[in-house]
A protein has these predicted regions:
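Active-site nucleotide/adenylate-binding loops and adjacent lid/helix of ATP-dependent enzymes
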Residues: 1-54, 64-69, 94-101
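Active-site-proximal flexible loops/turns
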Residues: 22, 127, 139-143
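Short hydrophobic/aromatic beta-strand element in the GNAT-like acyltransferase core
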Residues: 45, 59, 118
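ATP-dependent carboxylate/phosphate-activation module, predominantly the ATP-grasp catalytic core
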Residues: 50-111, 134-149
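A glycine-centered beta-loop-beta connector
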Residues: 66-68, 123-127
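A short glycine-rich, hydrophobically flanked beta-strand micro-motif that places a catalytic Asp/Glu
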Residues: 114-125
Length: 149
């Protein structure tokens, strides 16, 4: 998981805890943005996080039951921007292999999760940095649902 302990070097990401499609996600490049978002920076509904640079992000959709992955689908997002925000910025999507299913399975097993979920993450030095885990049907799965079932 990218660091959530500030203060952060610029740029860093600032987002609403409960959100859809990055609508309330901001990349803070400096003091100018911090001043502009001063009220939100103090809100308990938001949090800041280290940004993982790169124009590629992944969403791994998983159906998990009895401690095992029954089905999974990995979607790769390639943004035109180095630090694109999924849902806000334009990207190209591709279905691809996920080499981190054992890690994701161990996480889900450790919290006793069963059901459908989605891991959103970026990769740095072959290590997945989990941006979020959505314990629900991920929005990006809808157009590929027939592939996973």
């Amino acid at each position: 998981v990218p660091s959530m302990e500030g203060p952060f070097d610029y740029p860093y990401i600032f987002k609403k805890k409960v959100d859809q499609f990055g609508a309330n996600t901001h990349i803070i490049h400096g003091e100018k943005e911090e001043k502009k978002l001063a009220a939100l920076l103090k809100s308990p509904d938001y949090f800041a996080q280290e940004i993982i640079r790169g124009n590629t992000e992944y969403a791994t959709h998983i159906i998990f039951k009895q401690g095992k992955i029954l089905h999974s689908l990995n979607i790769k997002y390639i943004f035109h921007l180095e630090m694109g925000i999924k849902g806000k910025d334009e990207s190209i999507t591709r279905i691809c292999h996920c080499p981190y299913l054992e890690i994701f399975s161990a996480i889900l097993k450790s919290i006793g999760f069963e059901g459908v979920c989605c891991f959103n993450y970026k990769v740095r030095n072959n290590i997945p940095y989990i941006i979020e885990i959505n314990p629900r049907f991920g929005g990006s799965l809808s157009r590929y649902f027939s592939v996973i079932v």
